[in-house]
Amino acid sequence: GKERMHRTSGIIPGVMAQTGMETSEIIQGIVAETKPDVVIAIDALAARSTRRLNRTIQITDTGINPGSGVGNHRVGLTEENLQVKVIGIGVPTVVDAATIVHDSMAHLLDTLEETEQKEFLEEMIAPHLHTMFVTPKDVDETVKYLSFTISEGLNMAFEEISE
């Protein structure tokens, strides 16, 4: 048999602070011009558990909303916005200070009611830390391995073996 790859293309649209353009605007223009069957959007995510940080790869058929995990809501890369199917792939690479405190004190917090937990966490975390997001010091190496894993998965998904 003979192997053949589907025709694919890729772009790294950057972030609005770098480009001055919404990622969705860039992708909408490309979609309008190239008319793909599907868009695969890959993004970093904010973890809601320190256990998931750099350890999971999330896949969805509902797209991605860039910046939403860190409170920087942008226009989503969704089928509704792009008029084409969108597969979202995300890896939690950052975590906020509240999640770190919550996970570190989980056993104590389990003894409290939900409203008490929230009050406790609000008192424990200084106001300027509410917008602090951190990433592990080995994030560059980890992203290299995770991106290889994702790229190999995509390569296998796009392979077409004909006999």
Report residues per predicted region.
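Short, flexible loop segments at boundaries between secondary-structure elements
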Residues: 69-92
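Short beta-strand segments
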Residues: 11-12, 41-43, 88-92
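Glycine-rich phosphate/diphosphate-binding loop of Rossmann-like nucleotide-binding domains
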Residues: 1-10
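Short glycine-/polar-rich loops that comprise or flank the Walker A/P-loop
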Residues: 6, 35-37, 82-86
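Conserved active-site and cofactor/substrate-binding residues in soluble primary-metabolism enzymes
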Residues: 18, 22-26, 34, 137, ...
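C-terminal functional extensions of proteins
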Residues: 89-163
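Glycine-rich phosphate-binding loop
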Residues: 24-75
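Short, catalytically relevant binding-site loops at active-site mouths
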Residues: 16-17, 45-48, 93-95
